């Protein structure tokens, strides 16, 4: 996947081509490729993938086809599921209040219950993180309006949170640099 980005390929078309076994890709097929890259990259499963296609583009596929597509992604990019598994170790370290390092050149530090320390000194935290042996899942307390709700967290979600946090740091830095010369009005995602 990194090579595709480096070569400035349209990774959505490349994924769709792998999924459908075709070189000429329609707009709808590219959307399937895009949804696969963006969702499966953070460990989206077949059920959610099927629902996402239906909700966002009125594309109806059966669960068997959704599973085939998700499995195709995981076979094409086996290092990504390996990354999710390594991120599960982050959850274990937080839950057990242990220090560990993560990422290329160990750029991210996990400081026990404090969470994942980002390069700018901010933290990604999962309040009251705990492991539920009955389900085999990690859960944490998430604020939803005025309520606190239990929310699942897993390796793929941790990777998504890290990617979003690092992107925010980069955009913030760029805004500071731009603001030295121009007035910043807003950002668009």
What are these regions (language model features)?
Residues 1-189:
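Conserved catalytic core of nucleotide polymerization and phosphodiester-bond processing enzymes
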């Amino acid at each position: 996947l990194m090579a595709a980005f480096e070569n400035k390929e349209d990774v959505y078309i490349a994924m769709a081509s792998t999924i459908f076994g075709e070189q000429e890709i329609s707009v709808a097929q590219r959307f399937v490729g895009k949804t696969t890259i963006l969702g499966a990259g953070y460990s989206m499963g077949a059920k959610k993938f099927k629902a996402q296609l239906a909700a966002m583009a009125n594309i109806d596929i059966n669960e068997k086809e959704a599973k085939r597509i998700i499995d195709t992604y995981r076979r094409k990019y086996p290092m990504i599921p390996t990354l999710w598994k390594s991120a599960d170790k982050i959850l274990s370290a937080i839950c057990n209040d242990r220090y560990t390092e993560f990422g290329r050149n160990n750029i991210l530090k996990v400081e026990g219950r404090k969470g994942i320390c980002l390069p700018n000194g901010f933290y990604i935290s999962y309040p009251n993180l705990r492991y539920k042996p009955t389900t085999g899942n990690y859960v944490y307390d998430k604020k939803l309006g005025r309520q606190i709700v239990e929310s699942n967290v897993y390796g793929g979600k941790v990777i998504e949170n890290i990617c979003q946090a690092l992107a925010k740091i980069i955009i913030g830095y760029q805004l500071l640099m731009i603001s030295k010369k121009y007035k910043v009005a807003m950002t668009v995602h």
